[in-house]
C-alpha cells in the first residue's frame, strides 16, 4: 500500500539510481505523509474457513468443487492461518516499520447467510475487532476492504450473487454492519477490490469463483454468458459501491471522521504503432478496463466506446443511479502490474458476442519482434515500470485528479532472488 496524490505527479522525475548501491534510497526520498504498507485478502490469508460460525463463500465452494482450476489444487481452508496467527503477522509488519495494513473482511464470516436476517456471527465480529485493535496497538492504520471477491455462498445460491439486483441492498446492509462495529477505529474504507477482475475472470473466463462463461468458449465453465454476464456483474458491483458509499457519507462519516473509496486495477496500453487505428485501440483498452468503472464513478455513465460497441448488452443507469455514482469516492485505490501493446483488431462478422472481443483490440506483449518488457513469473505480467506513471497521469488528466492510493503493485518471480530485480519495477 503506497499513498500518492496525483496533483504532484507532474513534478516527478526518475532518480538516476545505481542498482549496485541502494544506500541513498530511503524514506526521506518520499514526501512527508507518504504511507508505506502491505495488503492481504481474507480468503487468501485467514484460513479457518469453517470455524467459529463462518459461512461458506463462493471461493470455498469453488476450490473444493473444482480443484483443477487452482494451479496447485489448494484452497483457503488454512491458507497462512492468519485467523489464529494474526499477532505474529502484525509483529512482522511492525518490525518492517510499516505505516498501514490493508486487509479485507470476510462477508460470510460476519454474516454467514449473507444477510442481516440470517444472523450476525459475533465470533467473526470479535476476530476483526481484535485484528483492528492489534494493528492500531502496533502503530499502524487499518485500511479495510469490504469485498475482496468472497461472496457468501448463500447469496450465490439464492440469486446468483452479483448477477442479482438484490445484492446491492444486501451489500449495503453488510457494509453498514461493518461501519457500526468498526468505524470508530477504521478511517480508510475500500468498498470493492478490483471489480474488473470479478467481472472478467468470474463471468467471462470462468477462472474465478463462481466459474461462469459461455459454453461455446469450451473453458469448462459452470454455465454463463460471456457477452452479457460480465457487464451485469460490473453494473451491480458499481451500484453496490454507490449504495455503501452513500450510506457512509450520509450517516457515519461526520461522526467517525473516515474516508471511503474503491480499488480498481488497470493495465497500461501502449499503441502498437503511431497509426491512428492503434492509438484508438490503446484508448479502447483503457476504456474497457479502467474507464468501465471510472467513467461511471466520475461522469455517471459508461465510456462512449463501450456504449457504441456493446450496445444493448451494456446495462444502463437510471438518472438517480447516475447521480449516486458520480463522485461517490473520497479516494481511488489503484492496482497496477502489467502493460500491453494494443493494436486494432478487425470486427468478425456474425461472431458470437463475448466481452473478450468487444473492445476490438489485439493486446500483446510483443509487436514486430519487439517485446514491451521482460516477463515475470506469471504469464500475464510484463515488467513495464513506466506504465504506472503513465497510468497515474492518465487518471489525473481524464478523471478529475482524484486522491490516489497505490493499493497494489509489483512483480513476482519463480525463484527466490534479491531485491535488485524488483527495484527497477
From Swiss-Prot:
PROSITE patterns xrefs: GLYCOSYL_HYDROL_F1_1 (PS00572), GLYCOSYL_HYDROL_F1_2 (PS00653)
Known glycosylation sites: 220, 412
Single GO molecular function: beta-glucosidase activity
GO annotation, biological process: carbohydrate metabolic process
Active site: 194, 408
Reaction(s) catalysed by this chain's protein: Hydrolysis of terminal, non-reducing beta-D-glucosyl residues with release of beta-D-glucose
Disulfide bonds listed in the record: 213-221
Transmembrane segments: none
Tissue specificity annotation: Leaves.
E.C. code: 3.2.1.21
Class in the EC hierarchy, top level: hydrolase
Keywords: Disulfide bond, Glycoprotein, Glycosidase, Hydrolase, Signal
Signal peptide coordinates: 1-11
List of residues binding a beta-D-glucoside: 44, 148, 193-194, 337, 408
Assembly behavior: Homodimer.
Family under the similarity heading: Belongs to the glycosyl hydrolase 1 family.
PANTHER family (UniProt xref): BETA-GLUCOSIDASE, PUTATIVE-RELATED (PTHR10353:SF240), GLYCOSYL HYDROLASE (PTHR10353)
Function per UniProt: Hydrolyzes cyanoglucosides, contributing to the release of hydrocyanic acid, which functions as a defense mechanism against small predators, when the leaf tissue is damaged.
Record-given protein name: Cyanogenic beta-glucosidase
Gene name, Swiss-Prot/TrEMBL: LI
